[in-house]
Amino acid sequence: MIGISADFDPVHLGHVDLIQKAREVADKKGEEVLIYLNKGYSANHAPFFVSFEARSRMALEAGADRIVPIEGLHHRLTMAYTVPIRIALMIQDGVTDYVDAAEVDPARIKKYAAGFIKRGIFSGIPRSLPNRNVIRWYAVNEFLYQRFKRKMEFHFIPEGKVNGEKISGRQIRREIIENNLQIPGNVVKLLPDSTVQILEEEIQQGNIPGHRNLEVLLKRLNTAPKHQLLNIAHLNAAAVEHIIQGRWYQAENQVWASLRQADYGPVLSRLALSCVEEDVTRREIYELIMDYERQGIIPPDQTMERVIERAWYVASMVDKGLTGSEAHEKFRKGSRTTDKSPYSFDAGLHLRSFELESLKEGMDAHLYVDKRGVLACELKPPGRKVKSPLKLTGKMATYLRLLIDSQVIPLQGELLKQKRGWRIRLKLG
């Protein structure tokens, strides 16, 4: 079988070229052309402009034989994780050939990929590299050969262009929206007739554009306490603080402004908003990735253990005088600590005498970072809230903050009574 993985939102002439190349390979081998079509959320973590059903029709009209829906990934995981999962699915389905478009010469793509494979790096491919995602697909396909003892053969065609300009699905969608949901003539030239017809039908039926559930999204952003927001995947402490400061939200673009203040780019902002909308927790992400790890699908530099190990290494090196960036770079080059990362440790509290009588051992301690950047917890005995900064050594405070800012490692706090007083037992993973 010949495979293509795509959004096709909508199918344009560049996509038609992809499908025709796949058709050419398939006809020589007597095989089918399968489109692994993203459903629910796009590969860039946004709601689709065109429905899955309409995009499926477009792909079939363009020459595909079958559509395989890919659902449940793109509102949860970054591309670094969705790519190995999708490639593994295709290999397991029996796909032997993969077709993609690239502006860079295929020999250069293979050369770039070989370097990352040799170093075992699949998530840190520089953004400056052209066709970065194609390089990632090729490298991960080679990595998964170790797991499946087979891999897909890649076929590259040039990226689709009209009059020397690359065809952009984003630009097509923008121009249709800005033209009051009428397809302008310059956009029609970029689309096959079948896509134009299906788009017009979908617009007439009121199915375009797709959108977020803003009622759910804004209510959660406006009302959830800080510790609950911090438990949502892909929100770090800075993002949560700026979200809290930016309340009350009435439109999505207001949330984007808050996320920009936390140095979130467009892709991470879309992913974070999708996680808030769908109430995706850190634990859900952690367990999902761990499940794929057990299947041998996740590259070693992306495992949850490696994320935790990196946090411990950086905290240890910062404690010895290195900067955070220096420690991260040394870790990337293979340096490690001799001791293992702690998955459980205790923190002290600052409690007032009148708060002590309401505390009970085993109570949940909800972690958060206050507006001054101080690590803290909130206890909820009956009828009151008890808030306290956490007492930690510098090394352990750095470790905890890095885990919080990992955006995916779940953290749990429990109140314990010890001889020296009350403590919070922190557990991760």
Feature-to-residue mapping (PLM):
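Beta-strand/loop nucleic-acid-binding surfaces
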Residues: 386-402
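Residue-level signal for inorganic ion chemistry
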Residues: 12, 59, 172
